[in-house]
Structures are given as C-alpha cells and as structure tokens.
C-alpha cells in the first residue's frame, strides 16, 4: 500500500517537472543564451528592415504632445499585425499593449511618442514633412525599439512567465504625459517599469545607467516685470523694467552659487527675455522665463526664485508676477532608479553586449517624465549609445539631430531581455497564483 502511494507521488512529481520543462524552457536555460537569441532575432534582416521602415515613417510625420493621432494609429496597426491585444485611448493618444499570460507578475516597458516644435535642418530622403515640427529627441526611435521588443516578445510569448505591458506614452516634452497615463491606470497591477533613451554622447553598442538619483527634477518659471515706459532720453520720468529684469537675472544665479551646497547640483537658467520694440523707448514691461533643475530641495528652490524676482523688482520700484506653471507645465520629480532593477539592467547589458558594454553614468541635470512612473513603482531608466567614430551626431533638441538606425535592434533586444529576465527571476522566486487579468 505504502509502495503504491510512493509510486503515485513520484509519478505526479515527474508530470509536474515535465510540465514546467515544456511550458517554461527559459527558466532552466542560461540567461546569456536567451538574450543572444533575442538579439539575433532583432538583428535579422527582416526585423531590422521592418524597424527602419517604421522609424522613418514616424520621423516624416512628427506630432506634438497629445496630438500623436497618426503615430498612435501606426502603433495600433503594427500591434494588430503582430497579434498583440491593446488598450486605447489612454491619456488621449496613448496605447497600452499586453503580451504573455495575462497573469502576474506584470512588468512594463515604456516609449514616448511626441515630437518637438523645431524645424528640421537635416536634408535627407525622410526629412520631416511637417513644417516647424521634428523628432529631435529620438522618440521615433524609442517607439520603434518598443515595437521591435513587442515583435520579439510575441514570437516567444509561450515562454513568458507573466505579462509584459507595453506603454506608448504621449506628451513627454513638458506636458507630463506620464502623469496623465498613470492617472488613467497605465500602471494597474504593474510591479516594475523600464525605459530607454537614445544618447549621442555614449558610444555605439554601450548602455549607461546608475542606481539612485539619475535625472534631475525640473520645473519652469515665467515672470512679468512691470514698470512705467517712456522715452529713453529721459529715463528719470520712467520706471525702467529692463534694469529691474537685468538685476533679477544676475540675482537668480546666486541661488546656486551662494545658497546651494557645492556638492548638491542645482541649475537656475533664464533662457528667454522679451520686451520692447524700439531703440529709443523704455517698455512698460519685460517678460523673463527659464528652467529650474534639482535633485533635492526643489520646492524650496521654487520659492526662492519667486522671492528673488518679486523683491528685486520692488527694489527697482517695479511690480512682478511669477508663474511657476506657465502653459500648464507642472514640475517633474527627479528620476530615481531602483537599485535591484539597476543591478538587473547591468547584468543584462553585459550578457547581451559584452562586459565592456555597460557604462556607469554620472547624474544628469536633464529631466524625464518617466519619473512619474518610477516614483509610483520600482523603475529603471537608461541611456543607449549611438555615437560612432565616423559620424558625428548632434545633441537632442537640435535641428540637426538624427539617430543611428543601427542601434534599433539593440534597444529592442534590451527591452525584451529586461522583461524576460524580470519575469524569469520572479518565477524562480514564486509568484501570485489564482489571479487573472482580463486584457
């Protein structure tokens, strides 16, 4: 009797092991072998040519924040052709795709879709067809890499130990599209999120990141300094807002040089000054505006900017009104990378591209609204290099900006590898059972 019971238990155990082996071969397979397969798939001529075609189509038809209707339509069309379910609309033009079991764990990959109000200065076959609009920050490449990852992951969907959520986000450039997507449930059930940004300052085939604070928090300000205009030859009969504005610009610089710990990076930049239209007339008012960047003490820095502007204006007998959210542009928190996800990213990059491919990044004073995702759940943001020795690449937000299309398979493979590795590690530790999300 005992022998029969033992044989029955042994048989059940063998059936379970065979089930795990047949359904989840990646659990036992070497990580580097898995990632090599993903990269090889991404670099295959068929997939690479497909990605280049998509990227160029998006580049030719740039759309600003919350206007990405055609970009979103293209994304949905490609997801349908691949066979991926999606949710639309999210945050007006956003799209969220789902690959895998529909059950936990859920891990997200994110790409931004919007272009910039810049006239493209690069003359080539696929130059922007829309006057005054251009993909000058690589978002066309970001969308393409995430679609590439979608194709890779769908090809291997039966091996996924959970669900990959594909977030195609609108309005990264100053309009906080990530925050709106978050408010509309983009992170529902998601346990971790990854994002990649192309960089012309990092060598091709390398990727950079750091644990903890990576990108600064950011905000903008606009102030109107009002005095009393008049003839420039008789300034004693005026209250000159130009002199007041000049004093304000200089005084704002002291917030960093004299009020900030030298070991704590902050930036206050006045980047626009408008006022007056004649050589011999002192204007009634001057408008100034700029940006603030900080990793810590951001609210205090905002308050000091407001105080300096209003009180320096008063010294010069002027009035000043300060707007810290002009055109609805809300401050963004700093982007802070989760330490465990950073370690995972570092390992994935080295396994995928070689030991020398990972670059330890310094903190960057640039900002990203990916931070809204990363302050809600564990997140990791990274930079993927596209610089090479033969071609110079302009920095982002330049009319001469262009991307190295050879980097597209690398970004797609890193995206896919991060998702696979995250789900694999969660599966090895055990995950929630008895849950099913209707996609």
Swiss-Prot record:
GO CC term (a single one): endoplasmic reticulum lumen
Family, per entry: Belongs to the peptidase M20 family.
EC class: hydrolase
UniProt keyword Heme present: no
Protein name according to UniProt: IAA-amino acid hydrolase ILR1-like 2
Domain of life (superkingdom): Eukaryota
Signal sequence extent: 1-21
BP terms from Gene Ontology: auxin metabolic process
SUPFAM superfamilies, alphabetized: Bacterial exopeptidase dimerisation domain (SSF55031), Zn-dependent exopeptidases (SSF53187)
Cofactor binding description: The Mn(2+) ion enhances activity.
Keywords attached to this entry: Endoplasmic reticulum, Hydrolase, Manganese, Metal-binding, Signal
Cellular localisation: Endoplasmic reticulum lumen
Main function: Hydrolyzes certain amino acid conjugates of the plant growth regulator indole-3-acetic acid (IAA), including IAA-Ala, IAA-Leu, IAA-Met, IAA-Phe, IAA-Ser, IAA-Thr, IAA-Tyr and IAA-Val. Is the most efficient enzyme of the ILL family for IAA-Ala. Not important for IAA-Leu hydrolysis in roots. May act with ILR1 to provide free IAA to germinating seedlings.
Positions of Mn(2+) 2 binding: 137, 139, 197
Record-listed E.C. numbers: 3.5.1.-
Consequences of knocking out this gene: No effect on the sensitivity to the inhibition of root elongation caused by IAA-Leu or IAA-Ala.
Annotated Mn(2+) 1 binding sites: 137, 173, 397
Tissue expression notes: Expressed in leaves, stems, siliques, seeds and flowers. Detected in the distal tips of cotyledons and seedling leaves, hydathodes of leaves from mature plants, pollen, ovules and developing seeds.
Keyword flag Endoplasmic reticulum: yes
Residue window of motif Prevents secretion from ER: 436-439
């Amino acid at each position: 009797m005992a022998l029969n019971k033992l044989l029955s238990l042994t048989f059940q155990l063998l059936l379970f092991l065979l089930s795990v082996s047949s359904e989840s071969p990646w659990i036992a397979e070497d990580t580097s072998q898995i990632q090599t397969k993903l990269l090889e798939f991404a670099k295959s001529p068929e997939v690479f040519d497909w990605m280049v075609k998509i990227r160029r189509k998006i580049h030719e038809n740039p759309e600003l924040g919350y206007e990405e209707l055609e970009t979103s339509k293209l994304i949905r069309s490609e997801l349908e052709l691949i066979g991926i379910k999606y949710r639309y609309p999210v945050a007006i033009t956003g799209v969220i795709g789902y690959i895998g079991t529909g059950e936990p764990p859920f891990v997200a990959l994110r790409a931004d879709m919007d272009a910039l109000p810049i006239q493209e200065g690069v003359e080539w076959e696929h130059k922007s067809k829309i006057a005054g609009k251009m993909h000058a920050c690589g978002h066309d490449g970001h969308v393409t890499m995430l679609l590439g990852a979608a194709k890779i992951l769908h090809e291997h969907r039966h091996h996924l130990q959970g669900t990959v959520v594909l977030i195609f986000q609108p309005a990264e450039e100053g309009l906080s599209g990530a925050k709106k997507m978050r408010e509309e449930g983009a992170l529902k059930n998601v346990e971790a999120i990854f994002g990649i940004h192309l960089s012309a300052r990092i060598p091709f085939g390398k990727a950079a990141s750091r644990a903890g604070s990576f990108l600064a928090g950011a905000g903008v300000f606009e102030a109107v300094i009002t005095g009393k205009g008049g003839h420039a030859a008789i300034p004693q009969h005026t209250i000159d807002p130009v002199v007041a504005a000049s004093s304000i610009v200089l005084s704002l610089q002291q917030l960093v040089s004299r009020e900030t710990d030298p070991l704590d990076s902050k930036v206050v930049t006045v980047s626009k000054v408008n006022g007056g239209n004649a050589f011999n007339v002192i204007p009634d008012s001057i408008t100034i505006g700029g940006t603030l960047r900080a990793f810590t003490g951001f609210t205090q820095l905002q308050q000091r900017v407001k105080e300096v502007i209003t009180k320096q204006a008063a010294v010069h007998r002027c009035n000043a009104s300060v707007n810290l959210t002009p055109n609805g542009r809300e401050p963004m928190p700093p982007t802070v990378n989760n330490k465990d996800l950073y370690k995972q990213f570092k390992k994935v990059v080295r396994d995928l591209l070689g030991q020398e491919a990972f670059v330890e990044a310094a903190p960057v004073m640039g900002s990203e609204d990916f931070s809204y995702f990363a302050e809600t759940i564990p997140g990791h943001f990274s930079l993927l290099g596209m610089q090479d020795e033969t071609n110079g690449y302009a920095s982002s937000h330049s009319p001469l900006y262009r991307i190295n299309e050879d980097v597209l398979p690398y970004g797609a493979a890193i995206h896919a590898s991060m998702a696979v590795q995250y789900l694999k590690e969660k599966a090895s530790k055990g995950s929630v059972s008895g849950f099913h999300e209707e996609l």
